[in-house]
């Protein structure tokens, strides 16, 4: 090997090595245990993924913008996780054991506690964790991953920041795939906006910084999104990537993997079959309907059990929710809590809720602002796909829009309107949420559509009236409080008026043009 080849080889390795060494130092510094042991563990995990990230970046075009996006996606999630780990014991609730250990969620705390106990007391072999059942991880993936990390890399201290590190790397790996898919299939503007939403969306940052499965699933779904967008160009390669993503999802969530299979089949049906003939079109619709019926019949007992438990938990934790459910009747409580869950995290509630700590107030506002900034663009897009002129493009967007609406509703219903679990399920399909949000903004801007403004005004009406309701709930001596149902009535009436203007204005314009034509 000559000197030039050696220099090139050094340059190839120096970037990932330095990045991994620096990242490992930061992770170890803010984690428990001996610094050198923690640094080595983080370095071993980070280096191979750094090489993968660099390869993905080059494959995605090697643009500086994409590199910035990937670094931002990684840094925000790892930074939030390390900050939370160190700040929660100080600024969290002192009577919550998981917060005193630096965990945002009790689920992650109990799962990690079980994994640490198994790794340190039972000394399992490499394959043994794959065959056992866990009390706090029904899918096994996160528990097995934690056991392996603690047993082989971190036996001296419980460094769950290593799980956060891996999750941040997975999310960052999805960036070049997601952006390239949108850039090639739609246009650069949609691609850039959607990719930045993917990077900065608050709930994605919060859940990724909490040793949860969401960042792993989101990263895999971003890659799967690319495979679906390119399936018509090179179906063998795309199908292989898609299959690999689904298989990797299974240890984290069979439910999400099944949902990914559903949207994949729908996408492929629209892309290749639906436009061939009416037989393929209606055959696919019939098969889809039959599949939904069979799925509901088989899964209904489990779904009812989950929903009943989550709804009951929500009612116990919220006195006013229990009161409202009592007023409307038990037969409507699932529908009410599903709709209520779509509004979670409720921005007015977080703004005025007390008592709470500064940390939880800041995190709550951060999450709620992200969702409420997305909602008008997202729902405008989901209800505007019918207006796309190209038939095949409209069909593809419509199928995906129906899937997203279904996923949002199922997430809300499954979580019983909970302010944490509901957004947690919803954010898993962030690539689809980010795409439709970006597409809606670009579509409205291109056709100069006032309907987007109406969606924004409707949301402002909701925020305004419920801000009054929540503020008066906690500060009754300052302002008169509207009854809940009166508040809902005001919101519905004002929203209906705003919505009606979208139909009245074209009608008036048509009448005027008719008169002008008649004269």
Regions inferred by a protein language model and the residue ranges of each:
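Transmembrane alpha-helix segments characteristic
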Residues: 16-22, 241-242, 390-413
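Transmembrane helical bundles and short interhelical boundary loops of multi-pass, membrane-embedded
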Residues: 22, 453-519
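Hydrophobic, aromatic-rich transmembrane alpha-helices
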Residues: 50-51, 179, 345-393
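Short hydrophobic/aromatic helix or loop-helix immediately within or flanking a transmembrane segment
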Residues: 107-156, 252, 341
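Transmembrane-helix motifs of polytopic, lipid-linked glycan transferases
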Residues: 146, 162-185, 376-380
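Transmembrane-helix signature of polytopic, membrane-embedded enzymes
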Residues: 157-164, 178-200
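Membrane-interface helix-loop-helix junctions at transmembrane boundaries of multi-pass membrane enzymes
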Residues: 184, 231-237, 380-403
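Membrane-interface alpha helices of multi-pass inner-membrane proteins
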Residues: 205, 224-231, 238-260
């Amino acid at each position: 090997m000559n000197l030039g080849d050696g220099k090139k080889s050094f340059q190839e390795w120096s970037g990932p090595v330095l990045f991994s060494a620096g990242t490992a130092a930061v992770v170890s510094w803010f984690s428990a245990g001996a610094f050198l042991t923690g640094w080595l563990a983080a370095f071993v995990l980070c280096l191979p993924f750094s090489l993968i990230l660099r390869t993905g970046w080059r494959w995605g075009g090697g643009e500086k913008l994409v590199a910035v996006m990937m670094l931002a996606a990684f840094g925000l999630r790892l930074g939030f996780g390390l900050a939370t780990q160190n700040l929660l014991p100080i600024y969290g609730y002192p009577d919550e054991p998981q917060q005193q250990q630096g965990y945002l969620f009790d689920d992650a705390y109990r799962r990690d506690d079980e994994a640490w106990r198994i790794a340190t007391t039972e000394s399992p072999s490499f394959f043994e964790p794959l065959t056992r059942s866990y009390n706090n991880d029904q899918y096994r993936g996160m528990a097995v991953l934690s056991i392996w990390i603690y047993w082989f890399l971190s036996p001296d201290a419980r460094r769950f920041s290593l799980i956060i590190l891996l999750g941040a790397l997975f999310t960052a790996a999805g960036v070049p795939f997601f952006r390239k898919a949108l850039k090639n299939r739609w246009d650069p503007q949609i691609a850039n906006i959607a990719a930045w939403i993917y990077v900065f969306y608050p709930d994605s940052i919060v859940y990724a910084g909490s040793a949860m499965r969401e960042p792993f699933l989101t990263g895999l779904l971003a890659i799967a999104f690319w495979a679906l967008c390119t399936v018509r160009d090179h179906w063998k390669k795309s199908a292989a990537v898609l299959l690999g993503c689904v298989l990797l999802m299974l240890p984290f969530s069979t439910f999400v993997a099944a949902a990914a299979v559903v949207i994949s089949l729908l996408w492929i049906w629209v892309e290749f079959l639906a436009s061939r003939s009416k037989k393929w079109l209606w055959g696919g619709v019939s098969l889809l309907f039959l599949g939904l019926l069979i799925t509901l019949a088989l899964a209904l007992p489990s779904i009812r059990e989950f929903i009943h438990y989550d709804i009951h938990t929500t009612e116990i934790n919220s006195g006013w929710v229990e009161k409202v459910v009592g007023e409307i009747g038990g037969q409507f409580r699932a529908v009410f809590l599903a709709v209520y869950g779509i509004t979670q995290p409720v921005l007015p509630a977080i703004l005025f809720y007390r008592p709470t700590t500064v940390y939880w107030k800041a995190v709550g506002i951060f999450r709620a602002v992200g969702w409420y900034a997305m909602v008008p663009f997202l729902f405008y897009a989901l209800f505007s796909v019918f207006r796309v002129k190209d038939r095949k493009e409209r069909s593809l967007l419509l199928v995906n829009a129906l899937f997203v609406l279904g996923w949002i509703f199922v997430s809300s219903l499954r979580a019983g309107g909970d302010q944490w679990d509901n957004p947690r399920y919803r954010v898993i399909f962030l690539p689809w949420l980010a795409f439709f949000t970006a597409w809606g903004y670009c579509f409205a801007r291109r056709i100069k559509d006032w309907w987007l403004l109406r969606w924004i005004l409707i949301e402002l009406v909701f925020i305004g009236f419920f801000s009054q309701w929540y503020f008066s709930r906690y500060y009754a001596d300052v302002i008169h409080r509207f009854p809940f149902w009166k508040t809902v009535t005001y919101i519905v009436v004002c929203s209906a008026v705003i919505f009606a203007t979208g139909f009245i204005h074209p009608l008036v314009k048509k009448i005027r043009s008719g008169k002008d034509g008649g004269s």
